[in-house]
Amino acid sequence: MSGIIATYLIHDDSHNLEKKAEQIALGLTIGSWTHLPHLLQEQLKQHKGNVIHVEELAEHEHTNSYLRKKVKRGIIKIEYPLLNFSPDLPAILTTTFGKLSLDGEVKLIDLTFSDELKKHFPGPKFGIDGIRNLLQVHDRPLLMSIFKGMIGRNIGYLKTQLRDQAIGGVDIVKDDEILFENALTPLTKRIVSGKEVLQSVYETYGHKTLYAVNLTGRTFDLKENAKRAVQAGADILLFNVFAYGLDVLQSLAEDDEIPVPIMAHPAVSGAYSASKLYGVSSPLLLGKLLRYAGADFSLFPSPYGSVALEKEEALAISKYLTEDDASFKKSFSVPSAGIHPGFVPFIVRDFGKDVVINAGGGIHGHPNGAQGGGKAFRTAIDATLQNKPLHEVDDINLHSALQIWGNPSYEVKL
């Protein structure tokens, strides 16, 4: 294979999957075939999309009811020649799913890149090992927290929140994705003030925390803004990839003057991936493509919290981010939304140690504040790695958290 293989889930009311697959393969490449003269067929053969797999799936009554028609469900795979497109994500996505995304109940499930095609993508600049080296933390999941309620607040409020989270043992603190450039907490001021706070905490407590600052602005200003952030001392750039596009992420990741990790936020991605019938699968969008384009971290809804993703999908995202691939470093999985200390055993069980445990309210909502919330998570992480049930741990911060949010593996009885 020298090009790319696209895998689709289709729902066809003509009940002829083979014919539908061939129509897609032709429609996204040379347009027609049987009516072409033999000589022209020979000339265009190398550009023709090739159907390489058709698999009928069991009938799904819920889908038929939803669509108000009886359809045949199937998985099809089509190979697109590398000759047909330039080696960039806009060209790849337009070739494999451009006008097809408008044509009925079709979902792009996966894209399989040839080794030759992979050479055109950067992958993560740091990856899991590089991030761990920055923090000098190699033997446990990382803990991340989020600034909360920053809109309309000044830099003093940010510094207080940051200090409390760092003292609590949080490894990474990230901006809220809806915190944009503003007069009260401008980008460079957040970075400079944040570094002062984190250096002070490190000198006092010996704990290192990184700050992920939100990179925002117009598309053609992003590189300048990123370089300004780097010059101010930014540790990590948080980026709302799907508000801008995967190619923009790749452009940032490939720039040697932006030598910091990039954290991809999934904002807007639900518009592409939420439906079971249309769009692009979450594992492809939030896993494989983010990794290829250069994200060191990928945030996505966890299977446990307030904006839950199906467990199978969440694990598939993580698989794409962390599976061995000689072409790319591994990206950190960051299952998010509604996470509290009681979920830590499940996160470690399902995602392993190479995961970032990301919490907002589960840290800030602790009765002992963000310091207590961070300490509760760190204690839960340590206990989980020691195979110790959370309810058996003698720690006031963890017990308080379990009282408030519960312990899914063992309901706390007081």
From Swiss-Prot:
Protein name per the record: 2,3-diketo-5-methylthiopentyl-1-phosphate enolase
Domain of life: Bacteria
NCBIfam families assigned: PRK09549.1 (NF007095), salvage_mtnW (TIGR03332)
Enzyme active site: 99
Co-factor(s): Mg(2+)
Record-stated family: Belongs to the RuBisCO large chain family. Type IV subfamily.
Catalytic activity from the UniProt record: 5-methylsulfanyl-2,3-dioxopentyl phosphate = 2-hydroxy-5-methylsulfanyl-3-oxopent-1-enyl phosphate
Protein role: Catalyzes the enolization of 2,3-diketo-5-methylthiopentyl-1-phosphate (DK-MTP-1-P) into 2-hydroxy-3-keto-5-methylthiopentenyl-1-phosphate (HK-MTPenyl-1-P).
Pathway field: Amino-acid biosynthesis; L-methionine biosynthesis via salvage pathway; L-methionine from S-methyl-5-thio-alpha-D-ribose 1-phosphate: step 3/6
SUPFAM superfamilies: RuBisCo, C-terminal domain, RuBisCO, large subunit, small (N-terminal) domain
Quaternary structure note: Homodimer.
Residues annotated as binding Mg(2+): 174, 176-177
